């Protein structure tokens, strides 16, 4: 089972192109700092503005750099089922351990359409699938009934849940059991998520605080919620600051402060505002990540 702190990796850019050297450096640093797993080419990785070739290259580079030291869950979702299958097939080819597959966005499929989409991916490629339920971005929500049907498919092993509805964790656990891998998609609510039966988080904050995020997850999984709460209190200002402006603008600014990459995004995303920068800077200092 996938569990612990999985980092939703940013994609570094330099002069408009993917900065492969910075990406490799980031992956190596994450592993050194104790991150439990890597998730390239998701929302935080600016996948909507990566070309297909860039997307595939980033996934391949992540797998090659990790060298099996930690699992790689490759972003492979699309609102075009054929495209999702293509990206999933490539992820398997280069050795990813699983894929993160988002619900159809913009075209707003019905529950039957959501099921048919993921079944097509499941049937086409033999690789573990983590469903990505983020209705705030996709407009559609995978209902409990549909989630239960999807878990009956051979390759569907769990969900990245970014609904911020903590009761859903318990409901899904009741329907599908503890073997259904539930990963939080919200840093701020990850404490409660794991208390309800979750086993980890695909984290934005882990880009700049990997050791703390890993220690936090280890504490919750060990049942040491006193220690987890101490870390949560330390990180909470940063969790909030990283979403003052649209993600990943604030976290790229934070990564730049640590010398990890340039503070560069692709349009239509723009760098964090001056006000957001001040909040991020203060939160980084509060967490002990900067002097």
Curated annotation (Swiss-Prot):
GO biological process, one term: diaminopimelate biosynthetic process
Gene3D superfamilies to which the protein is assigned, alphabetical: Aldolase class I
Catalytic residues, chain numbering: 132 (proton donor/acceptor), 160 (schiff-base intermediate with substrate)
Keywords in alphabetical order: Amino-acid biosynthesis, Cytoplasm, Diaminopimelate biosynthesis, Lyase, Lysine biosynthesis, Schiff base
SMART domains: DHDPS (SM01130)
GO-annotated cellular components: cytosol
Family: Belongs to the DapA family.
Protein name as catalogued: 4-hydroxy-tetrahydrodipicolinate synthase
Organism, as annotated: Parvibaculum lavamentivorans (strain DS-1 / DSM 13023 / NCIMB 13966)
